[in-house]
Amino acid sequence: MDRRNFGKLLAGTVTAAGIPLASVAEERTRSVAEGEPALHGRNSAVTKTAPRGNNPWELVILDAVPPHISETGGMAAADVDGDGKTEVVIIGVGAIVWYRPSTAEKGIVSLGRYGVGVALEDIDGDGRKEIITGRTIPDSSGGPEKWILCWYKSGANLNDPWTEYILDSETAGHAHDMIFGDLDGDGKRELVANARYCDRPGLFAYKIPADPKRPWKKQMVQTGLTAEGTSVGDLDGDGREEIVSGPYWFSAPKAGAFSGQPWKTHSLAPGFRELCRTAIIDVNGDGHQDVVIVEDEYPDGRLAWFENRIKAVPEHPWIEHPLDAPLNFSHSLRAWRDDKTKQMHIMAGEMNAGGWNAPYNWEARLIDYSTEDGGKSWQSNLIYEGEGTHEAVRADLDGSGTHVIFGHAAQVVNKTENIGWLQMFRPQGKPSVFAHYSHKFVDRQKPYTGIDIHAVDIDGDGLQDIVCGAWWYKNPTWERHPIPGIGQIIAAYDLDEDGRKELIGIKAKPGAEDYESALTSDLVWLKPIDITKDLWEEHAIGSGDGDWPHGNTLGPLLPGGRLALVCGYHDHSHSPPQIFETPDDLTQLWAKRVIADIPYGEEMIAYDLDGDGKLDIVAGPYFLENLGDGRFEPHLLIDPKYAQFENQNAISRIAIMDVNGDGRPDILFTVEDVDWNDNVRKAFFAPVGWLENTGSPRDRMFNLHFIDRVRSPHSIGIGDIDGDGETEVVVGEHDPFHPYRSKCRLYIYKKADPKGITWSRFPIDNRFEHHDGAKVVELSPGKISIISHGWMEQSYVHVWQQG
């Protein structure tokens, strides 16, 4: 079923199979009349609003790589330190980490293996929230690790050491869900936690003792039932809160919630599977607490609310009102009533993928459903599409009454670890200036793949044309013209200082069967003579010792301002980068030599990184210091202990920008991560980040910062795209195996704080693969454009412009 048509289906008269909705409801009603406790009500009419590009929400990446966490698990948000602003706590395999979004600060609470369930609650009555969660400990007999429940108290400052207290040292399994509620009606809240992924799953309640540092009183609610999605609320109106867990609800014995007597199990949603998210709220305003439920680990999950009739019609205590389907791994669910508008809202968020090797969900959605008439009709507002989230929570960021949504990515396509990133979705009042970009095919029949793309005024008319592969495209008609005798153009520079740029290219290998085998390092430079007749003047530079140049830079690098070309080769492990020195007579061969014995062959930039007046070379993680006598001394800029950079060639594309405003040039980078093994053939999520200039590149390594993690990013560009005086970053994804099916994205990033710790991400396109593209250029006066191309989508040359 096409989920985008589901809103129409709910309001229509037939299902996708041609069965009248009334018949479906009648059939369901008949089945429950034979013993099931839930009746099937009318499908609520859902009106869908806010199509792609019109929604004024933006995504902020608060942390692309949470420290010490190899697999993100759960999260919670509240004012932990009493400053009136919201903190976020995220847990996972490796650590508990706290964040202060208002200042972009973060810190470590504890190291260890944590799961999904986490809650924030004032345990000791001091007015500040503590962290409650579960972690593993070694089994003393050498068996599998055991789970315990514990809570953490901060010092006077969140950066001070936190103290751990164990509340249950003998749990049955992983506490996937945690929530607090008043189960015994004494005005104090108790903990509810389930046990999952164990031999004997169950659900348990814990009462906080007078001294919460001691073990807590434990009550079994149920054992043997597998269920996820725990919430609490007074369902039967007795003044005590009951527990909902998946498709069941549980009521305490009359003797009391912690009397030791068994709790009673009731059926709530018999047609729903066990793995759910739930929320309790009075949907229709009749004074009774209803239940919202969504199936969370399925690609065909259903969302519904169940009308509470426990007291009115005890023989049929629940009426099911379907809301939406299919929802794809919707592992986030929240419900609330707006204090101002009195509208009731449900927020559902889909994951990137479910567990157990589920198919990837490239179009994951975050959706807000609202009703003004007690659940009779609903509006569906698409908050965000194309970004999966897990265990998302809603919170007032700074006490202003404006709520944001915090979440984290889960089940992303990583090579070895499930490192998710921390998200904040925030309303903006109006759509972003980046929301409406138009795409144009410059070429959709280019004969073969280009290895780079450039904007160069070829014909001298004052407009930047586009050069890609062995062709140039005239602006603005984009007619394709050949550059004769050339395999690829790799650079453009005004070599003879006549005010127009010449092109540097490589010759094609004669008789090659395809473009890749035709690549060489036979370098030439070209000058247009009569472009109306495709006449060019060609001069040899020389042949490099590598296979073909995958990165290069050109500038006055040598004593006296002499020009030189530096090339890094695709087979960098065998051929270090070389420098080609311009002769006095440019028509002669250029002298070549190895510039530095480093294993790098990707993008290079000539830039005075150390501020001494001489152009250095930035080569990925290396700084090649210009010594002023024609020699260049290599310095590694980052600590190789970072796993992402064990292969230093993993840094693929770079740009120079003063990110944090300290006046020093920093290095933006992307990391290519592709596995060409026939048994794998995947493009993995890899970092986009920046290296902070510490002031002395030759003496001190740069500080590493992550912006985001996207699919094998192999394209980067920078420019003031929105005209506000600040520089934005453009990044394109690169999936050479499944470019169409995997929906490669083109993103714009804008700093969300002045220091560049957090970044807002704006999707521009989700259709094309990018390789050495995403260049920010000015194709017409005062109008910024983005040009790009792909590796496998060889026929395409693209341009994006606003409007």
Model regions and ranges:
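Beta-propeller-forming repeat regions
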Residues: 4, 30-803
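N-terminal export signals
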Residues: 5-25
